[in-house]
């Protein structure tokens, strides 16, 4: 059973977050291992496995990028384990430039200001590509959506690096 079916949701990118959370809580109560504490070992193990599946499904569907990756996995794209590299040379150059810019910001005397500007640009790039991905998934353009998700994964990793740098800069001020 796929995660969308498990939660009673249509298999689409745009989902009702409150419905997801409500169904998650219902399933958690229904399959909580404590409810099976006095049952035979086989039933206890089955409830543990079901609870783990429910948790994995919820974490996947809750997170927009993971949800997109999961939708693509249902179409045969295993983005989590692939060695596929992007052939978009313009994007590859953009990646290099963004990483170099972030490295330069870290060494800059006004790093906080530059990092705020960089972070805003990164947020706009992520928003633009996310909108494109939503359109592609909606039109079932799986190959194009997979490429866009690969690019969003890079931007997501870069955002994590920005947050780490912010923490280091904040710690240096303390």
Swiss-Prot record:
Q: Which SUPFAM superfamilies match?
A: Chaperone J-domain, HSC20 (HSCB), C-terminal oligomerisation domain
Q: Where is the J domain?
A: 2-74
CDD domains, per database record: DnaJ
Concerning Gene3D superfamilies, the annotation shows: DnaJ domain (1.10.287.110), HscB, C-terminal domain (1.20.1280.20)
Q: Which domain of life is it from?
A: Bacteria
Q: Does the keyword Chaperone apply?
A: yes
The UniProt entry, under InterPro entries, shows: DnaJ_domain, HscB, HscB_C_sf, HscB_oligo_C, J_dom_sf
**One annotated GO molecular function:** protein-folding chaperone binding
One record GO biological process: [2Fe-2S] cluster assembly
Keyword tags: Chaperone
What is a single cellular component term in the Gene Ontology annotation? Answer: iron-sulfur cluster transfer complex
Listed Pfam families: DnaJ, HSCB_C
| The protein's role, per its UniProt record | Co-chaperone involved in the maturation of iron-sulfur cluster-containing proteins. Seems to help targeting proteins to be folded toward HscA.
**How does it associate, per the subunit comment?**
Interacts with HscA and stimulates its ATPase activity. Interacts with IscU.
Which family does the UniProt entry place this protein in? Belongs to the HscB family.
**What name appears for this protein in its UniProt entry?**
Co-chaperone protein HscB
Species annotation: Yersinia enterocolitica serotype O:8 / biotype 1B (strain NCTC 13174 / 8081)
């Amino acid at each position: 059973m796929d995660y969308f079916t498990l939660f009673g949701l249509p298999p689409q990118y745009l989902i009702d977050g409150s419905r997801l959370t409500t169904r998650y809580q219902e399933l958690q109560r229904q399959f909580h291992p404590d409810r099976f504490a006095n049952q035979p070992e086989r039933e206890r193990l089955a409830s543990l496995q079901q609870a783990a599946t429910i948790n994995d499904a919820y974490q996947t569907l809750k997170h927009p990028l993971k949800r997109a990756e999961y939708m693509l996995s249902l179409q045969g794209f295993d983005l989590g384990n692939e060695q596929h590299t992007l052939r978009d040379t313009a994007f590859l150059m953009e990646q290099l430039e963004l990483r170099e810019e972030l490295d330069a910001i870290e060494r800059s005397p006004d790093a906080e200001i530059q990092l705020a500007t960089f972070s805003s640009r990164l947020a706009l790039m992520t928003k633009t590509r996310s909108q494109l991905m939503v359109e592609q998934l909606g039109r079932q353009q799986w190959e194009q959506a997979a490429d866009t998700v690969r690019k969003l994964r890079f931007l997501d990793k870069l955002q994590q690096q920005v947050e780490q740098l912010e923490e280091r800069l904040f710690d240096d001020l303390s």
